[in-house]
Design a protein with these regions (language model features):
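A generic alpha-helix structural signal
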Residues: 9, 31, 103, 107, ...
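Short runs of predominantly hydrophobic/aromatic residues within well-ordered alpha helices
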Residues: 137, 171-184, 206, 254-257, ...
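NTP-dependent nucleotidyl-transfer catalytic core
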Residues: 1-202, 210, 217-222, 235, ...
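Conserved nucleotide- and phosphate/pyrophosphate-binding catalytic cores
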Residues: 213-357
Length: 357
């Protein structure tokens, strides 16, 4: 059992989210006092979020369930640079029109999971271009740059790995840490946000923001990271033979989404039930105890619950019916969904069976 006093942190803990935190005791006290404000940043590199983003979305959902206020930060400014974290080469830059179109598409992905509005714990969505776009270069250097050392920045995993491999690491990318840290400072000032959530790959960037707030405002801020999710076979969460598993319905149908979760590997079912559903702990433990072919029952529950969260109960029920018809119907199959698989995708598939699951 977790030793956290905060119900928010206790739930994150038993569900298996928490990897690292700053100032654990102080963070717990802040969350336990009620109405904590926390943010997650999302760069607008595509017009939809994908399953890989669900980890942090679910963290915001749990925060709101326990009375906290979620802040979804759109990276209209930082996307102009591109997050270099865990990237082996520089990303191509997007135009402002592309970034704005992507932000418009991303907004719809949040709505099934968190409630937006003007209430004390209603979520808000903000765009860091509102301050980064107005920040002059000299002002940025004076306000932020003076608080960071090159010595520290080159020790970050992504920077060190690129330099060791003699891969280019542009000055543009080098500024990403400063910009993300400044985001935290602005959210602290504008919205009283004292906590940043993210994947473990963002740990260095989060620490930068926590430190900047302490140095410039004398304020107390916190960071919490979650484990990066991979399947038991080592595949990055949300990636399939056909590409990313998108959250927007126009990019991935409810049936495809349901089928993705139904095809979860046996060893991952319990973990994914904890991370990606609202099921209570006792029910999850019951499903985790299933053995043999009964694991398929747990997989169906996982597929139903995750699809219900994103697309609604009716869409989840229809997806289940379609999948069942595909398995057991002896009638015509013209009405079933069809998908084209390129030769390249076929060639990289670990097996034909993986494509036919």
């Amino acid at each position: 059992m977790s030793d956290y006093k905060s119900e928010f942190l206790r739930e994150l803990s038993w569900r298996g989210f928490i990897k690292d935190t700053t100032h654990k005791a102080e963070l717990d006290a802040y969350c336990a006092q009620g109405n904590p404000v926390a943010y997650v940043g999302y760069d607008a590199t595509a017009d939809s979020l994908h399953v890989g983003h669900l980890m942090t979305i679910m963290m915001l959902r749990i925060l709101q369930r326990h009375g906290g206020k979620p802040v979804a930060l759109m990276g209209g400014g930082t996307t102009r640079i591109g997050d270099p974290t865990d990237k082996e080469k520089t990303r191509p830059l997007l135009t402002d029109d592309q970034i704005n179109a992507n932000i418009a598409g991303i907004k719809t992905a949040f709505e099934p999971f968190i409630r937006f509005g003007a209430g004390p714990n209603d979520a808000i969505m903000v765009n860091n271009d509102d301050w980064l776009g107005k920040l002059g270069y000299v002002e940025m250097l004076r306000a932020v740059g003076m608080h960071f050392t090159i010595n520290t920045m080159v020790k970050q995993d992504t920077v060190a790995r690129r330099l060791a491999a003699e891969q280019p690491y542009s000055f543009l990318e080098f500024n990403y840490l400063l910009m993300q840290s400044y985001d935290f400072l602005e959210l602290f000032r504008r919205h009283g946000c004292r906590m940043q959530l993210g994947g473990s790959d963002q740990w260095g960037n989060i620490l930068g923001g926590v430190d900047l707030i302490h140095k410039t405002e004398g304020g107390e801020a916190f960071g919490l990271t979650a484990h990066l999710v991979t399947t038991s076979s080592g595949v990055k969460m949300g990636k399939t033979v056909g590409g990313a598993v998108w959250l927007n319905a126009d990019r991935k149908s409810p049936y495809e989404y349901w089928q993705f979760w139904r095809n979860t590997e046996d060893a991952d079912v319990g973990r994914f039930l904890r991370l990606f559903t609202d099921l209570k702990q006792d029910e999850i433990m019951r499903l985790e105890a299933l053995q043999g072919t009964q694991i398929n029952d747990a997989k169906k529950v996982l597929a139903d619950e995750t699809t219900k969260l994103l697309h609604g109960e009716i869409a989840a029920s229809e997806a289940y019916t379609t999948a069942t018809s595909a398995l057991y119907s002896v009638g015509p199959v013209e009405s079933l969904p069809t998908y084209e698989i390129s030769k390249g995708e076929w060639d990289i598939s670990p097996s034909t069976v993986a494509l036919l699951k």
